[in-house]
From Swiss-Prot:
PROSITE patterns xref list: AP2_ERF
Organism from which the protein derives: Oryza sativa subsp. indica (Rice)
Transmembrane segments: none
GO cellular component, one term: nucleus
Name of the gene: DREB1C
Region (Disordered): 1-24
Function field: Transcriptional activator that binds specifically to the DNA sequence 5'-[AG]CCGAC-3'. Binding to the C-repeat/DRE element mediates high salinity- and dehydration-inducible transcription.
Family: Belongs to the AP2/ERF transcription factor family. ERF subfamily.
Record-given protein name: Dehydration-responsive element-binding protein 1C
Keyword Nucleus: yes
Length: 214
């Protein structure tokens, strides 16, 4: 029995859940796509709880084997608590629900109907794959800044390969032709100032030529 038209509801596609701003030091367990769903323990099980409108209390709906089952349970509670103002994880949850959400008056009634829908609804393998892919993308995005910082630290601690290639083969204990020439003797000065090398034409040799001659 259809109590509401499924297209009248907002979904996580049209109104995605808000993510907390800034960096957090705790491990994120909430599902990146589905509302009211979070991971519990290393076994990979999923739990669902919803906050009652205008209250601080929450309604515990249970632990489920898949994130999709927990997301279905959330939809039942959202329909019961918020009516047409509910934001659903799946657009067809209202159509698949076998009871009128308005009749779910107590937390026990909501929990019972939520578990029934979660267990009876066929879980789409494509939806499960998309959920896993979204979680992997989020984990990769969170790890990227740490990887970049590690890369920068490694680059700062490693000497430049160019500097090593240029200076690594120089023997600083050997005489330097450059500094020998600057000292006023040696091969460098003889080669630079000897005019006989170019026949005395066009060079600095070929006679007594001084700087002030120009």
């Amino acid at each position: 029995m259809e109590y509401y038209e499924q297209e009248e509801y907002a979904t996580v596609t049209s109104a995605p859940p808000k993510r907390p701003a800034g960096r957090t030091k705790f491990r994120e367990t909430r599902h990146p796509v589905y509302r009211g769903v979070r991971r519990r323990g290393p076994a990979g099980r999923w739990v669902c709880e919803v906050r009652e409108p205008n209250k601080k209390s929450r309604i515990w709906l249970g632990t489920f084997a898949t994130a999709e089952a927990a997301a279905r349970a959330h939809d039942v509670a959202a329909l019961a608590l918020r009516g047409r103002g509910a934001c659903l994880n799946f657009a067809d949850s209202a159509r698949l629900l076998r009871v009128d959400p308005a009749t779910l008056a107590t937390p026990d009634d909501i929990r019972r109907a939520a578990i029934e829908l979660a267990e009876s609804c066929p879980h789409d393998a494509a939806a499960a794959a998309a959920s896993s892919s979204a979680a992997a993308v989020e984990a990769s995005a969170a790890a990227a800044p740490a990887m970049m910082m590690q890369y920068q630290d490694d680059m700062a601690a490693t000497p430049s390969s160019y500097d090593y290639a240029y200076y690594g083969n120089m023997d600083f204990d050997q005489p330097s032709y450059y500094y020998d020439g600057m000292g006023g003797g040696g091969e460098y000065q003889s080669w630079q100032m000897d005019g006989d090398d170019d026949g005395g034409a066009g060079g600095y040799g070929g006679g007594d030529v001084t700087l002030w001659s120009y």
